[in-house]
Curated annotation (Swiss-Prot):
Membrane topology: Peripheral membrane protein
Pfam families: Glyco_tran_28_C, Glyco_transf_28
Catalytic reactions of this protein: di-trans,octa-cis-undecaprenyl diphospho-N-acetyl-alpha-D-muramoyl-L-alanyl-D-glutamyl-meso-2,6-diaminopimeloyl-D-alanyl-D-alanine + UDP-N-acetyl-alpha-D-glucosamine = di-trans,octa-cis-undecaprenyl diphospho-[N-acetyl-alpha-D-glucosaminyl-(1->4)]-N-acetyl-alpha-D-muramoyl-L-alanyl-D-glutamyl-meso-2,6-diaminopimeloyl-D-alanyl-D-alanine + UDP + H(+)
GO biological process, one term: cell wall organization
InterPro entries found in the cross-reference section: GlcNAc_MurG, Glyco_trans_28_C, GlycoTrans_28_N
GO CC entries: plasma membrane
SUPFAM superfamilies, per database record: UDP-Glycosyltransferase/glycogen phosphorylase (SSF53756)
Name of protein: UDP-N-acetylglucosamine--N-acetylmuramyl-(pentapeptide) pyrophosphoryl-undecaprenol N-acetylglucosamine transferase
Any one GO molecular function term: undecaprenyldiphospho-muramoylpentapeptide beta-N-acetylglucosaminyltransferase activity
Pathway(s) served: Cell wall biogenesis; peptidoglycan biosynthesis
Function (record text): Cell wall formation. Catalyzes the transfer of a GlcNAc subunit on undecaprenyl-pyrophosphoryl-MurNAc-pentapeptide (lipid intermediate I) to form undecaprenyl-pyrophosphoryl-MurNAc-(pentapeptide)GlcNAc (lipid intermediate II).
Biological source species: Desulfitobacterium hafniense (strain DSM 10664 / DCB-2)
Amino acid sequence: MRVIVTGGGTGGHIYPALAIAKGILVHQPDAEILYIGTREGMEARLVPEAGLEFAGVSGQGLPRKLSLETLKVGGKSFKALWETKQILKKFKPDLVVGTGGYVAGPVVLTAALFGIPTLLHEQNALPGITNKILTRFVRKVMVTFPESIAHFGVRRKLVLTGLPVRPEIGNISRERGAACLGLRSDCLTLLVTGGSRGARSINQAMPTVLKHLAGRKDIQVIWATGKATYQETLESLKTQGIQWQRENWRVLEYLKDMPEAMACADLFVGRAGATTLAEIMVAGKPGILIPYPLAAENHQEFNARALEKDGAACVILDKDLTGENLWALVQGLIEKPEKLRKMAQAARSLGQPDALNKIVKVCLDTAWK
C-alpha cells in the first residue's frame, strides 16, 4: 500500500498529517508513506525528523489583496501542480490524504483528477478555503467539529472523526501528573498556556490573577509563558511585587510535560487552536478560551464558540481581555465546583479519544474500495 499525505504552512496542518501517517503504519507496517510539502515550510524540517520520506514542491499562501505578489504566488501554484504530477507518476499512490494548507491544494486536486482515491481532514469548526474548494473532488472529508458540517456543500461525503491527540492525553492519572510537576493532587489546579510561543495578552493579564490567588495555598497554578516572552513576564511580575516562586505555582518558559499538566489540571486557560481543544476535550477539562485574533478567517473563535455552545468553555475575546476580566471568569468557576464539574463532563462528552483509529479506518476503506 502506497500513501501520500500532504499538509503544511502551520503546525495545525502538519501534526495531524504526521499522526495520520504514523497511524496508517501501525495498521499497515509494510505501507510506503510519502509526505509532500513545501520546501520552505516547517514540514521540510519536521517530516524528516519524524522519520518519514519527504518530497518538496513549490508553494506559498495567497496574499489577502490582489497585487504583483498574487501573480507570483499563482505562478508557484502552477509549478506545484506540475511537480506534483511528476511525483504522482513516479510514486503511484493508492491513496492521497490532505490536511489543509496551501500545499494540499495542488496535491489533492492533481491526485483526484488522476483518479487516485483522495481524502481530506478538516481540523477547525470553520473549514479552511483550500478544503472547501477541494470537497467536490475528493471521496470523503473527515471533520473534527460537528459545527463544520454546515460549511461544506456535499454532506454525504462528510465523516465526523475528531482530531488525533497524543496517546498520553487522558491516560495519565491525576496523581502521576501532579507528582511529575512537584505539585499536590488534592488541590484545585489552573493550567495556563499560550502555546510554545506564548501569548502576550494572556501573559499581561495573568499577574492580576496571581495577585488574587497569592493567599490561596489550596489553589495551584501551572503557567507556561512561552519562550519569547518569559523574561519579559518575569520582569513584569517583579515590577508588580509578585513573588512567583512559590511551592504551589509553576511559572515556566515552556511546558514539556503537557500531558501530565493536563492530567492534574481542573481548569484550562489558553488559545483555541484545534489541537489544543481536541486535547482538552479528550482530557475532559473545562476551558476559558481566548481565541488568537489573527488566526486565518478567525477560525479560533469559531472553534471556541463550538465548545461554549455545548457548555464546555467560556470565551473572552483578545480585545476584551484584561487582568480583572480574566480573574472574574476564573473566580466564577473555581468558587463553583458543581459548575466546573458539569463543564468538565461536557468537554469529555465532546472528545474523540479514538479519532486516529476512525481516521485510519476511513483511509484503509477508501484505499481498498
